[in-house]
């Protein structure tokens, strides 16, 4: 459920909405833009092993790598740095070179299971306003369907 937007002062004036204090920049040489700082998905009640066992065939993306997002369209692509092919609800073998591709809003609507665990990670978000530190956190989530790109190993 969308609760709010990240809006800096200038964006708020343009859209007639109040600023949420989301303007960030690397340093004074960059113009500020609306940027994430701490982004989280709350923990759910599903067991991680059960999510895999009931998925049928798919990809278990254990660790994600870098990627990019088009803020105008919500389109994204992210590398899977550690992934496993799942066949009949069982982890079959590791995969390499996989990437997840989609549109943020559409993929969020396809989350069908949310795990009990919750982990955090630090990263860097690069944009026109420079590179700034970020903090993200989420439990394991299962997405009913999405585009997976890559090549045969």
Each predicted region: which residue ranges?
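N-terminal small-residue-enriched
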Residues: 1-153
């Amino acid at each position: 459920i969308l609760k709010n937007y990240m809006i800096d002062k200038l964006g708020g004036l343009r859209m007639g909405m109040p600023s949420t204090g989301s303007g960030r920049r690397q340093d004074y040489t960059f113009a500020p833009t609306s940027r994430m700082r701490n982004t989280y998905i709350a923990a759910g009640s599903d067991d991680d092993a059960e999510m895999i066992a009931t998925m049928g065939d798919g990809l278990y993306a254990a660790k994600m790598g870098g990627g990019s997002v088009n803020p105008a369209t919500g389109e994204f692509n992210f590398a899977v740095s550690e992934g496993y092919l799942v066949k009949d609800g069982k982890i079959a073998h590791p995969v390499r070179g996989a990437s997840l591709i989609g549109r943020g809003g559409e993929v969020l609507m396809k989350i069908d299971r949310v795990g009990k665990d919750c982990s955090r990670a630090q990263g860097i978000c690069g944009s026109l306003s420079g590179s700034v530190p970020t903090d993200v956190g989420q439990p394991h989530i299962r997405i009913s369907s999405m585009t997976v790109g890559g090549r045969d190993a």
